[in-house]
Amino acid sequence: MMSMYEKFVNLLNTYCNQAGYPIQIEKTLHELSLDDANSVNVFTSEYKDLNSISMDSIAQNVVARIHFGGQSRKDVAPASVDSFLIDSNGYWYFIEFKNQYISSKKVKEDCVKKSYANVFWLFKILDEMQRKQLFSFDAYSSCTTEISPFEFVKKYCKFILVIGNDKVDNELNRIREAKKAKMTMPDSCRFLRKLESYVFKSADVYSADQFDREFVKKFRYS
């Protein structure tokens, strides 16, 4: 029996093929963590390298082409996170890798911009597939009732920011400690608090090693 993730991969492949732009949409987390500017991968697993959906590939090679006359250009593509997964419990994960300090203004702005944009264009695709009777939320999640897209994102979608190990600082440690103790997060991570309050079920940050131990090691497709 196919996992919800595998069925979602097939759904997006169907969308890409019907749009006339068949592409390879899956890559490993290691591959998707590549920092192009410095030619370094932010994440390497000691346990297992999960296959995941490349949101950048779909945004740049399919969505951009549909709206810009067949052009596959990064500068006209909608913003997107690096990776997307669905686990055995039916939760959806939007994952962004950054080889920068969490205190960086660019990191914070990118996370907010990419989250909003990616949710919008992905759910626009899902709306098109739903109109063709090829998609329903209950087939790709643990949702058992009819639900609006906005409610679905808030109840079943989670955001994860992964910071490179050599960019871990006191600010990241304070955020992690506050999260574990279920205390109010520092003002410096207000962008995560906003994402969790307004968009996602949760918004978390890990170092690459923490992500490996606490998420990847425990992750199950089915």
Task: Give names to the regions the model predicted.
Residues Q100-A178:
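Catalytic cores of nucleic-acid endonucleases
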Residues A79:
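Beta-rich catalytic cores
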Residues L11-T14, K218-S222:
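A hydrophobic membrane-anchoring alpha-helix module
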Residues N17, D127, E177, S197-F200, ...:
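Generic surface-pattern signal
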